[in-house]
Structures are given as C-alpha cells and as structure tokens.
Amino acid sequence: MSKCYITGKTTLFGNRRSHAMNATKRIWKANLQNVKIIDENGKIQKVKISARALKKLKLQRA
C-alpha cells in the first residue's frame, strides 16, 4: 500500500451512508505525489509525498 514518506498517511477505509443509512464500503486515498528529493547524505531519492506535506514543508527537491 502506498504511504507518504513524511507523514505516514495511507488509505482510509469506511462506509458510504445513504439517506436510509444503508452502508456500502468505500476508501479514501491520500493525494500522493511522486517527488525527487535530496536526502541528508546528498543523494537523490524518489519518494511519495502527500500534497499537504509538499505544501507545508520546504524540502530540497532535486
């Protein structure tokens, strides 16, 4: 399962509820983006980062 490299966000599972409260399964997927970053050793690394983490954090992108 895909996971955010920074925040650890993954897919959430739950139910969709109709007006009559009938339940059907559904999933919520994290908005993950493929990004190349430069890690602390100076190496380029391809990781998946959530869009929120990408906006909030100032990463050194490759």
UniProtKB/Swiss-Prot annotation:
InterPro entries reported for this sequence: Bacterial_rp_bL28 (IPR050096), Ribosomal_bL28 (IPR026569), Ribosomal_bL28/bL31-like_sf (IPR034704), Ribosomal_bL28_bact-type (IPR001383), Ribosomal_bL28_sf (IPR037147)
Keywords: Ribonucleoprotein, Ribosomal protein
Any Pfam family the entry gives: Ribosomal_L28
Gene3D superfamilies associated with the record: Ribosomal protein L28/L24
GO BP annotations listed: translation
Transcription among keywords: no
GO molecular function: structural constituent of ribosome
Regions crossing the membrane: none
GO annotations of cellular component type: ribonucleoprotein complex; ribosome
Family statement: Belongs to the bacterial ribosomal protein bL28 family.
The protein's name: Large ribosomal subunit protein bL28
